Curated annotation (Swiss-Prot):
Role noted for this protein: Binds to the 23S rRNA.
Gene Ontology terms: cellular component: ribonucleoprotein complex; ribosome
Family, as annotated: Belongs to the bacterial ribosomal protein bL9 family.
Protein name: Large ribosomal subunit protein bL9
GO BP of this protein: translation
Pfam families with a match to the protein in the record: Ribosomal_L9_C, Ribosomal_L9_N
Organism: Oenococcus oeni (strain ATCC BAA-331 / PSU-1)
GO molecular function: rRNA binding; structural constituent of ribosome
The entry's keywords: Ribonucleoprotein, Ribosomal protein, RNA-binding, rRNA-binding
Keyword Ribosomal protein: yes
Length: 151
């Protein structure tokens, strides 16, 4: 019997896959537990429509990430911070990924999730820093951060 898997089933099939399985296994386990449905023409067309929708969504998300990368790559997009500096030239506090994401939203109206910023440790020195950001699995960008001394 041909079935369409609704979710991944170990050693049998992945979500969205159409596969021939034994009748008893299909009826007594897969369909009963809502892990698969019969591969009728109607269900196959639903699956194709669903896959097309998912592909369009993925393409839109990728395009948004590329646009955000272009905005971040602009020479004008430098996130500014003014912090108190100690006598040794180091910041009294630090600039974290959350603060960078907040300032991006505040200064440039760009929304970047703090978890996408790959800041190994918080910035503790003044000057211009580049922070890598993984906006999408296929799109990475560099965010320029300028930390200056607060007068």
């Amino acid at each position: 019997m041909k079935v369409i898997f609704l979710q991944d089933v170990k050693n049998q099939g992945k979500r969205g896959q159409i596969k021939e399985v034994p009748d008893g296994y299909a009826n007594n386990f897969l369909i009963k537990n809502k892990k698969a449905v019969y591969a009728s023409p109607e269900n196959i067309s639903k699956l194709n429509g669903q896959q097309n929708l998912e592909a369009k969504k993925a393409a839109e998300i990728l395009e948004e990430a590329k646009q955000l990368k272009n905005k971040l790559a602009s020479t004008k997009t430098i996130v500014q911070f003014s912090e108190h500096v100690g006598p040794d030239g180091r910041l009294n506090g630090s600039v974290t990924a959350k603060e960078i994401a907040d300032q991006l939203a505040k200064q440039f109206n760009l929304t970047v999730d703090k978890r996408k910023l790959q800041l190994p440790q918080p910035i503790k020195t003044i000057g211009l820093h580049e922070v890598p950001a993984k906006l999408h699995t296929q799109v990475s960008a560099m965010i320029k951060v300028n930390v200056s001394e607060l007068n």
